[in-house]
Amino acid sequence: MSGASYLYKAKPLKEGYTIIVGPENSELRFIEFGRLYLPEVGDEYADKTRDREVVLTIFNGLCDVEVEGYQKRGDESILYQNIGGREDVFSGRPTMVYLPRDVECRVKAKTPGVEVGVSKAPSENQWPPRLVKPEEVMERTVGAWNWRRRVYTSIGEWVKADMLLVGETINPPGNWSSSPPHKHDTKTDVEAPYEEVYFFTVKPPQGFGIQRI
């Protein structure tokens, strides 16, 4: 392990998209993660996925997501209306949208203060765009005792994607996550190398967490 920092603190929210971590500011080779913030009703943000697949995780608020450029739909756009709606990430299962490479996406706020997590990774295939509703999320409880937690997996093997696997984990106060200790940075018979990014939020806001690597 090098002396590089493995902790990247979230920056103050500003309107639009803010990169938190990615290849340009860390040792990551593939994954980029950031936050999209639309403070007012009617605010919009548009971007192109280019050579990457993207997953939008609606942290809170209600929004529309429009997708253009998916080859199998020609000039016809795909519109997911009034999706999300959570008060915060602790208020139920997430809503996520999978975006393939080479499309344009537009997010429009339907309520004030829409916040979206944005995960990106290189992709070779233009898989179908996909809305994953809360009722489609796989929920399971893992661990025991003080390392028990609830895991929501939205983008798993049932969603066609090249690289991204995306979900949320809810930890009771004082419990550990990612336990038992493990790693996945070496290719062996029992281990496969892949990158992993955690984005932490706490409730109440003055709470704190500790991560040991």
Residue ranges: model-predicted function:
Residues V114-V159:
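An exposed, glycine/acidic-rich loop-and-rim segment of catalytic or binding clefts
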Residues R50-Y80, P173-G174, D185-I213:
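Glycine- and acidic-residue-biased ligand/ion/polar-headgroup-sensing regions
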Residues R101, A109-T111, V118-P122, T153-G156, ...:
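Short, structured patches in soluble enzyme cores that scaffold and shape functional sites
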Residues G3-S5:
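Long, compositionally biased, intrinsically disordered regions
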Residues P12-A46, E53, W145-V197:
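A short glycine-rich, His/Asp/Glu-containing loop-to-beta-strand
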Residues E87-Q126:
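Ligand-binding loop in jelly-roll beta-barrel domains
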Residues Y45, V67-R101:
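Short acidic-glycine-tyrosine-enriched beta hairpin
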